[in-house]
Amino acid sequence: CTTALNLPAYMPKLLHERKNSVLLFLPQAHSFARAINYICVASELHIYIAQGIKTLIADLQVAKPSVMIVVPRVLEKVYNAASQKAGHGAKGVAFAAAVVAAQNYMKEVSAKGKAGALAKARRMAFDPVVYASLREVLGGRAQWIVAGGAPLDPELMAFFRGAGVPVYEGYGLTETTAPCAFNPLGVPYHQGSVGVAFPGFELRIAEDEEIQVKGTAVFPKYHKNEEASEDSFTEDGWYRTGDLGRIDD
Protein backbone atom coordinates (compact mmCIF):
# COMPACT_ATOMS: atom_id res chain seq x y z
CA CYS A 1 0.00 0.00 0.00
CA THR A 2 1.03 3.63 -0.39
CA THR A 3 1.70 4.09 3.32
CA ALA A 4 4.10 1.15 3.38
CA LEU A 5 5.95 2.46 0.34
CA ASN A 6 6.33 5.88 1.99
CA LEU A 7 7.73 4.59 5.30
CA PRO A 8 11.36 4.31 4.10
CA ALA A 9 11.38 8.11 3.72
CA TYR A 10 11.18 8.33 7.51
CA MET A 11 13.03 5.21 8.64
CA PRO A 12 15.63 4.50 5.93
CA LYS A 13 18.37 3.22 8.24
CA LEU A 14 16.10 1.02 10.32
CA LEU A 15 14.43 -0.54 7.32
CA HIS A 16 17.63 -1.51 5.56
CA GLU A 17 19.42 -3.29 8.40
CA ARG A 18 18.26 -6.91 8.54
CA LYS A 19 19.43 -7.35 12.14
CA ASN A 20 16.65 -5.00 13.24
CA SER A 21 13.32 -6.30 14.51
CA VAL A 22 9.84 -4.90 15.07
CA LEU A 23 7.46 -5.59 17.96
CA LEU A 24 3.80 -4.92 17.18
CA PHE A 25 1.23 -4.25 19.90
CA LEU A 26 -1.51 -3.08 17.54
CA PRO A 27 -4.18 -5.56 16.36
CA GLN A 28 -3.46 -7.02 12.94
CA ALA A 29 -6.73 -5.55 11.66
CA HIS A 30 -5.38 -2.05 12.39
CA SER A 31 -4.40 -0.16 9.22
CA PHE A 32 -1.07 1.03 10.63
CA ALA A 33 -0.15 -2.48 11.79
CA ARG A 34 -0.90 -3.73 8.28
CA ALA A 35 1.32 -1.05 6.74
CA ILE A 36 4.17 -1.90 9.12
CA ASN A 37 3.79 -5.60 8.29
CA TYR A 38 4.04 -4.92 4.56
CA ILE A 39 7.17 -2.82 4.80
CA CYS A 40 8.84 -5.26 7.21
CA VAL A 41 8.22 -8.15 4.84
CA ALA A 42 9.56 -6.08 1.94
CA SER A 43 12.64 -5.12 4.00
CA GLU A 44 13.18 -8.68 5.34
CA LEU A 45 12.92 -7.58 8.98
CA HIS A 46 11.88 -9.83 11.85
CA ILE A 47 8.36 -9.16 13.16
CA TYR A 48 7.26 -10.09 16.66
CA ILE A 49 3.58 -9.98 17.60
CA ALA A 50 3.03 -9.12 21.27
CA GLN A 51 0.80 -11.53 23.18
CA GLY A 52 -0.90 -8.74 25.09
CA ILE A 53 -0.49 -6.02 27.68
CA LYS A 54 -0.15 -8.56 30.53
CA THR A 55 2.96 -10.12 28.98
CA LEU A 56 4.48 -6.79 27.92
CA ILE A 57 7.75 -6.96 29.86
CA ALA A 58 8.41 -10.59 28.93
CA ASP A 59 7.66 -9.91 25.25
CA LEU A 60 10.13 -7.01 25.25
CA GLN A 61 12.91 -9.19 26.64
CA VAL A 62 12.29 -11.89 24.03
CA ALA A 63 11.99 -9.59 21.02
CA LYS A 64 14.55 -6.91 22.03
CA PRO A 65 13.01 -4.75 19.30
CA SER A 66 14.67 -1.97 17.33
CA VAL A 67 11.22 -0.65 16.46
CA MET A 68 8.04 -0.78 18.53
CA ILE A 69 4.56 0.10 17.32
CA VAL A 70 2.43 0.77 20.39
CA VAL A 71 -0.64 2.47 21.76
CA PRO A 72 -0.12 5.02 24.57
CA ARG A 73 -1.38 2.48 27.13
CA VAL A 74 1.78 0.42 26.59
CA LEU A 75 4.02 3.35 27.49
CA GLU A 76 1.81 4.17 30.45
CA LYS A 77 2.24 0.60 31.70
CA VAL A 78 6.03 0.78 31.34
CA TYR A 79 6.08 4.07 33.25
CA ASN A 80 3.80 2.77 36.00
CA ALA A 81 5.85 -0.41 36.37
CA ALA A 82 9.05 1.62 36.74
CA SER A 83 7.40 3.93 39.27
CA GLN A 84 6.05 1.04 41.33
CA LYS A 85 9.42 -0.72 41.29
CA ALA A 86 11.07 2.43 42.64
CA GLY A 87 8.61 2.46 45.54
CA HIS A 88 8.08 5.25 48.07
CA GLY A 89 11.47 5.38 49.79
CA ALA A 90 14.74 6.89 48.63
CA LYS A 91 14.46 5.11 45.26
CA GLY A 92 11.01 6.58 44.78
CA VAL A 93 12.28 10.08 45.49
CA ALA A 94 15.13 9.56 43.02
CA PHE A 95 12.75 8.27 40.35
CA ALA A 96 10.42 11.26 40.78
CA ALA A 97 13.37 13.64 40.48
CA ALA A 98 14.56 11.79 37.36
CA VAL A 99 11.11 12.21 35.79
CA VAL A 100 11.18 15.97 36.41
CA ALA A 101 14.75 16.26 35.09
CA ALA A 102 13.85 14.45 31.85
CA GLN A 103 10.70 16.51 31.33
CA ASN A 104 12.44 19.82 32.00
CA TYR A 105 15.24 18.87 29.61
CA MET A 106 12.79 18.21 26.77
CA LYS A 107 10.75 21.32 27.55
CA GLU A 108 13.87 23.42 27.06
CA VAL A 109 14.62 21.57 23.82
CA SER A 110 11.06 22.28 22.66
CA ALA A 111 11.13 25.96 23.61
CA LYS A 112 14.71 26.91 22.70
CA GLY A 113 15.91 24.24 20.28
CA LYS A 114 18.40 22.90 22.83
CA ALA A 115 18.67 22.43 26.58
CA GLY A 116 20.80 24.60 28.83
CA ALA A 117 23.86 23.38 30.71
CA LEU A 118 22.00 22.90 34.00
CA ALA A 119 19.20 20.85 32.43
CA LYS A 120 21.79 18.72 30.60
CA ALA A 121 23.74 18.11 33.80
CA ARG A 122 20.65 17.10 35.76
CA ARG A 123 19.58 14.74 33.02
CA MET A 124 23.03 13.14 32.75
CA ALA A 125 23.15 12.59 36.51
CA PHE A 126 20.13 10.29 36.32
CA ASP A 127 21.10 8.41 33.16
CA PRO A 128 23.16 5.58 34.70
CA VAL A 129 20.87 5.06 37.70
CA VAL A 130 17.37 5.48 36.20
CA TYR A 131 17.19 5.99 32.45
CA ALA A 132 19.57 3.16 31.50
CA SER A 133 17.44 0.68 33.46
CA LEU A 134 14.32 1.94 31.68
CA ARG A 135 15.93 1.41 28.28
CA GLU A 136 16.87 -2.15 29.29
CA VAL A 137 13.26 -2.88 30.27
CA LEU A 138 12.34 -1.95 26.69
CA GLY A 139 14.79 -4.54 25.37
CA GLY A 140 17.91 -2.37 25.22
CA ARG A 141 17.86 -1.87 21.43
CA ALA A 142 14.94 0.50 20.80
CA GLN A 143 15.74 3.06 18.12
CA TRP A 144 12.19 4.00 17.21
CA ILE A 145 9.01 3.70 19.30
CA VAL A 146 5.91 4.86 17.46
CA ALA A 147 2.83 5.66 19.54
CA GLY A 148 -0.52 5.91 17.81
CA GLY A 149 -4.20 5.06 18.06
CA ALA A 150 -4.85 7.69 20.74
CA PRO A 151 -3.21 10.91 21.99
CA LEU A 152 -0.06 10.44 24.06
CA ASP A 153 0.22 12.56 27.21
CA PRO A 154 2.81 15.29 26.38
CA GLU A 155 4.34 14.96 29.86
CA LEU A 156 4.80 11.22 29.35
CA MET A 157 6.33 11.84 25.93
CA ALA A 158 8.73 14.39 27.43
CA PHE A 159 9.79 11.92 30.12
CA PHE A 160 10.58 9.11 27.70
CA ARG A 161 12.36 11.36 25.22
CA GLY A 162 14.34 12.99 28.01
CA ALA A 163 15.31 9.54 29.28
CA GLY A 164 16.81 8.67 25.91
CA VAL A 165 13.89 6.53 24.80
CA PRO A 166 13.10 7.51 21.17
CA VAL A 167 9.31 7.87 21.27
CA TYR A 168 7.62 9.43 18.25
CA GLU A 169 3.98 10.32 17.75
CA GLY A 170 2.00 10.59 14.57
CA TYR A 171 -1.53 11.30 13.42
CA GLY A 172 -3.78 9.46 11.04
CA LEU A 173 -7.02 7.60 10.52
CA THR A 174 -8.14 4.41 8.84
CA GLU A 175 -9.48 6.64 6.05
CA THR A 176 -5.96 7.98 5.41
CA THR A 177 -4.45 4.47 5.46
CA ALA A 178 -2.94 5.18 8.91
CA PRO A 179 -0.38 8.00 9.30
CA CYS A 180 -0.80 11.26 7.41
CA ALA A 181 1.45 13.24 9.78
CA PHE A 182 4.53 12.04 11.59
CA ASN A 183 7.72 13.07 13.41
CA PRO A 184 10.58 11.92 11.17
CA LEU A 185 14.22 11.90 12.22
CA GLY A 186 15.77 15.34 11.91
CA VAL A 187 12.61 17.34 12.63
CA PRO A 188 13.02 19.52 15.76
CA TYR A 189 11.13 18.30 18.82
CA HIS A 190 8.06 20.35 19.77
CA GLN A 191 6.02 19.19 22.74
CA GLY A 192 2.49 18.19 21.77
CA SER A 193 3.22 18.10 18.03
CA VAL A 194 2.45 15.13 15.78
CA GLY A 195 5.04 16.23 13.25
CA VAL A 196 4.79 17.15 9.59
CA ALA A 197 2.75 15.88 6.66
CA PHE A 198 3.64 12.33 5.66
CA PRO A 199 5.05 11.98 2.10
CA GLY A 200 2.19 12.01 -0.39
CA PHE A 201 -0.18 13.99 1.86
CA GLU A 202 -1.30 17.60 2.21
CA LEU A 203 -2.84 19.02 5.38
CA ARG A 204 -4.85 22.16 5.94
CA ILE A 205 -6.92 23.70 8.71
CA ALA A 206 -10.48 24.81 7.93
CA GLU A 207 -12.06 27.98 9.32
CA ASP A 208 -13.63 25.96 12.15
CA GLU A 209 -10.14 24.49 12.93
CA GLU A 210 -10.98 21.07 11.51
CA ILE A 211 -8.00 19.13 10.14
CA GLN A 212 -8.53 18.31 6.46
CA VAL A 213 -6.40 15.92 4.42
CA LYS A 214 -5.68 15.24 0.76
CA GLY A 215 -3.34 12.59 -0.63
CA THR A 216 -2.83 9.45 -2.67
CA ALA A 217 -3.60 7.16 0.30
CA VAL A 218 -6.86 8.86 1.32
CA PHE A 219 -9.80 6.53 0.75
CA PRO A 220 -12.17 7.45 -2.12
CA LYS A 221 -15.48 6.54 -0.46
CA TYR A 222 -17.19 4.30 2.08
CA HIS A 223 -18.50 0.94 0.92
CA LYS A 224 -22.18 1.20 -0.03
CA ASN A 225 -22.68 4.44 1.89
CA GLU A 226 -22.87 7.32 -0.55
CA GLU A 227 -24.34 9.76 1.98
CA ALA A 228 -21.49 9.30 4.45
CA SER A 229 -18.98 9.50 1.60
CA GLU A 230 -20.37 12.83 0.38
CA ASP A 231 -20.40 14.27 3.90
CA SER A 232 -16.78 13.27 4.44
CA PHE A 233 -15.32 15.43 1.67
CA THR A 234 -15.29 19.14 0.92
CA GLU A 235 -16.40 20.46 -2.46
CA ASP A 236 -12.76 20.74 -3.53
CA GLY A 237 -11.94 17.15 -2.53
CA TRP A 238 -10.38 17.39 0.94
CA TYR A 239 -11.23 14.72 3.50
CA ARG A 240 -12.92 16.07 6.64
CA THR A 241 -11.30 14.30 9.61
CA GLY A 242 -13.64 15.70 12.25
CA ASP A 243 -10.58 16.42 14.42
CA LEU A 244 -9.41 19.85 15.55
CA GLY A 245 -5.83 21.04 15.23
CA ARG A 246 -3.46 23.76 14.16
CA ILE A 247 -0.40 24.03 11.95
CA ASP A 248 2.66 25.88 13.24
CA ASP A 249 4.84 27.63 10.69
Positions of PLM-derived features:
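Ser/Thr-glycine-rich phosphate-binding loops at phosphate-binding pockets of nucleotides
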Residues: 1, 172-176, 241
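Conserved AMP-binding/adenylation subdomain of ANL enzymes
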Residues: 2-22, 28-131, 141
